[in-house]
């Protein structure tokens, strides 16, 4: 018997609230934090989010009868209270994998964080976490190369990599920019980098900048016998221009390029990652604009979701925050998304804000890049927090050294001392001060850096904290 079409407005709960539903292995699972408008029941709010982010609209439509709505609809299957927050609650929603185009993080985001975020019945909405089923993960190409391949390309093993963002970030001519790159690489760094807003400005057009940077890299490599690199930012006004810059970087021998994946867009980023894989070029990812989306604890997208999206879209490095520097970052939450970048399988762990198990299959891991207000005194904590597969990037903490290019040498000595102490079984965060003092006895560069920044701290409370019960 044909189904009967009943016109009119139907309560979302009748179709999209399914507390008895058991999610399938192939379902994409999402956890939303919801604050409904006054008078809107929780059950209605969670069902509305499931509807508006999948197949629903505000009224019943006759075209529902032309498809298998039960197969395609999102299902709100559970809710939980948010510890310490009486207004908010968590809603867990399962989406059938067929709702999403294969390999398209753009399509996933368009559904999960699209129109639903402007829904009037919801006062605040935040996407806290997503479980991507392995069946979907395997449709994405992911990082162009990954951690192990990068170590092989750069011939660097057994320690975090060391970098520096060239400062001032804007205003240097191409020749002076190249000089700064050379001094940093010659002093002992593995990488230098463009900052996120270095593109092609009147003071330094991109091609001139690329040429002087490659000249600096080649000179530093000849003098040190080490592989060196600089993240050449190919973010551009159009995809065609972006690929033109990437092609030129490859032509002149650059080992690594850079992209601002949020401001540049996920379509551009996924395409660039595929190009890097095909052309043997490493890809560093900057997260400029992330805090607009993730810093508000009640509305937006949590950074752990942006981390997962980047791993699917593609990048060999991603900025993750530092915990100890000048930028926002809760320690346990940061450790959580670092694991989501690097590990093959991550278990649910609410103490670190991870709501779902996540299986990445054979997808390569991503280097965690930490930068922002860090200096030599932070080195013991950074090596402890980030471990081996990280890029520690000191901008002002390199170029702010009173002796100029000695800042690079100071950071290299501090890193080597901490890695050696770690390998000998020392607890770096407890013994770090003594480790650095001992190393400084043989390094005037490190000693001066320690004296310069001994009073510098960034002691501000984290805005976006993990949701835990107030004591």
UniProtKB/Swiss-Prot annotation:
User: Subunit structure, per the record?
Assistant: Heterohexadecamer of 8 large chains and 8 small chains.
Which residue ranges run through the membrane? none
Q: Which GO molecular function annotations are given, in alphabetical order?
A: magnesium ion binding; monooxygenase activity; ribulose-bisphosphate carboxylase activity
Name of the protein? Ribulose bisphosphate carboxylase large chain
Q: Which family does it belong to?
A: Belongs to the RuBisCO large chain family. Type I subfamily.
Instruction: Share an example GO biological-process annotation for this protein.
Output: reductive pentose-phosphate cycle
Cofactor section: Mg(2+)
The coding gene here is cbbL
